[in-house]
């Protein structure tokens, strides 16, 4: 299967529950010592429709040990999302480890290297549902000590540090809102 399914689909076991819907158990990836949230997340997917590639994002905080600020990035495109804020990241390529994809995407988008912390998960799973039927894995991270500061590239209009208490006032992409709320909750425990 191609079109974003590839290796991703080959690793899934389908369990048909109706003639038109499968419940697919997406395997947890090996994240080289990173804490995962759950072993599987169940996602309804129409039969014959390839699963889209997963997406990864970083909730970049000023400090993993004592977070007070988050790097919020406003989208440059597409036009309907322009100016709305998101957590930076991107697609996992075929056969790519999600943690490696996250490091690659942040280097491409923001020119920074990260120290990756704990995964931020939805209740009962490890992948967040987002736009276009995709799913997203999110990790807390901080800028690595040997890295330059993140800066907005072609994908973003701006990248700015925002106090955790002020994040709700930003115009977030709708799919990122529950994720940002979970990030704030995990940072303020």
Annotate the PLM regions.
Residues 40-71, 91, 122:
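Conserved N-terminal beta-strand and adjoining loop/helix that marks the start
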Residues 30, 82, 138, 143-189:
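Nudix hydrolase/Nudix homology domain
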Residues 66-108, 112:
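Conserved Nudix-box catalytic region and its N-terminal flanking loop in Nudix hydrolases
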């Amino acid at each position: 299967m191609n079109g974003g399914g590839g290796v991703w689909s080959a690793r899934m076991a389908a369990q048909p529950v109706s003639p038109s819907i499968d419940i697919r158990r997406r395997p947890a990836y090996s994240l080289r010592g990173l804490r995962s949230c759950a072993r599987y997340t169940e996602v309804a997917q129409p039969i014959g429709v390839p699963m889209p590639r997963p997406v990864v994002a970083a909730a970049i905080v000023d400090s993993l040990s004592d977070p007070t600020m988050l790097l919020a990035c406003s989208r440059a495109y597409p036009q309907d999302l322009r100016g709305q804020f998101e957590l930076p990241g991107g697609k996992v390529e075929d056969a790519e480890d999600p943690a490696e994809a996250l490091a690659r995407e942040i280097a491409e988008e923001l020119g920074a290297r990260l120290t990756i912390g704990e995964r931020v998960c939805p209740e009962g799973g490890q992948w967040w549902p987002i736009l276009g039927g995709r799913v997203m894995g999110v990790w807390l991270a901080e800028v690595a000590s040997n890295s330059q500061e993140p800066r907005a590239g072609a994908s973003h209009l701006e990248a700015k540090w925002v106090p955790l208490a002020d994040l709700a006032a930003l115009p977030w992409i709708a799919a990122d809102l529950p994720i940002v709320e979970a990030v704030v909750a995990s940072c303020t425990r």
